[in-house]
Design a protein with these regions (language model features):
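Mid-domain alpha/beta scaffold segments of enzyme catalytic cores
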Residues: 1-117, 123, 232, 240-241, ...
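Residue-level detector of anion-binding/catalytic polar loops
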Residues: 33, 137-138, 191
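Short amphipathic alpha-helical segments and helix-helix/interface helices
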Residues: 23-24, 67-71, 96-99, 125-129, ...
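Proline-centered flexible-loop/turn and helix-kink motifs
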Residues: 75-76, 104, 162-163, 188, ...
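Active-site neighborhood of phospho(di)ester-bond hydrolases with catalytic His/Asp-centered motifs
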Residues: 2-5, 36-39, 81-83, 110, ...
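Divalent metal-binding pocket/active-site signature
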Residues: 85-90, 97, 101-179
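Short active-site segment of divalent metal-dependent hydrolases/proteases
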Residues: 9-10, 145, 173, 222
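H/E-rich (His + Asp/Glu) clusters that bind or coordinate divalent metals
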Residues: 165, 172-270
Length: 270
């Protein structure tokens, strides 16, 4: 079994156009059983830290509804991770009401400090964490790429909220992962994921802390419908190493924890 805890839907011209159909076809082709998705249409800043133009901005409640509409197409295969616009908006009454109404489709909240230029330990996010704690939902956050997104800020939030599970997506993207790897073992409610993380880092995390701390995630279909096979230039995808070579480096139990059992436990996926 494979659970992908980090995939995307939504369009952000001219960079991304990722559809629910792409995710489902990819799951069929590469043997992924369940996928958690968030919508990139909640991005507030682009990769150059420029505000996303107003005509491309969507209100948080619309992004939430669109995400729920997507996972309703296949609720036995897709789950929602609503992406929060933490720079410009906080959960309002409509957002909270919708989340409660469709709680069965929602498996956590997604933060993207890089695309929001807001750190997870910013005190303005306390209402987000209060809602997550009330509903028993984990927090999944991009790490890496700018100061606000570095893993230490998610660590600070996790330390302040020991009853909430926090996942460091990317383990500090674009780095040697050392800082995130060191933080991973410091709190029982802090986890990492494999999205663009070298296999060697994942193996080291399991060697240090056991097999319960890392989750399988991919960013699918960020490089197109065959993200799990090759990148945009046709080079073999990192995830082929996770599907094949990594099996030889871990025990069966360790591999199962990484690829689906940890996700089942943390996100309460049945």
């Amino acid at each position: 079994m494979i659970i992908d805890t980090h995939a995307h839907i939504g369009a952000l011209p001219p960079f991304f156009d990722m559809t629910t159909e792409q995710v489902l076809r990819s799951m069929d082709k590469y043997g992924v059983d369940f996928t958690l998705v968030s919508s990139i249409e909640a991005a507030e800043f682009d990769h150059q830290s420029n505000p996303v133009p107003d005509f491309l901005q969507k209100p948080q409640n619309r992004v939430l509804r669109d995400t729920l509409d997507a996972v309703r197409q296949a609720p036995d295969r897709l789950g929602a991770l609503p992406w929060l616009k933490i720079n410009q908006e906080l959960p309002d009454a409509e957002f909270i009401r919708t989340v409660r109404e469709y709680r069965s489709l929602i498996y956590g909240f997604k933060l993207h400090p890089f695309h929001s230029l807001t750190a997870p330990d910013d005190e303005r996010l306390e209402p987000v964490y209060a809602l997550a704690e009330e509903l028993g939902l984990p927090i999944v956050s991009h790490t890496g790429g700018c100061e606000q997104a570095m893993s230490v800020h998610l660590y600070n939030a996790a330390k302040r909220h020991p009853s909430i599970d926090f996942v460091m997506v990317h383990m500090d993207l674009g780095t040697d992962n050392k800082a995130a790897l060191d933080l991973l073992g410091t709190l029982p409610n802090l986890y990492g994921d494999t999205t663009w993380v070298p296999v060697s880092t994942t193996v080291e995390a399991i060697r240090r802390y056991g097999s319960k701390k890392m989750l399988f995630g991919t960013d699918n279909p960020i490089d197109g419908p065959d993200t799990l096979l090759h990148n945009k230039t046709g080079e073999r995808s990192l995830y082929q190493q996770y599907f094949h070579e990594l099996r030889e480096l871990l025990s069966t139990a360790e591999y199962s924890d990484l690829m689906y059992k940890n996700a089942q436990r943390i996100f309460h996926i049945k």
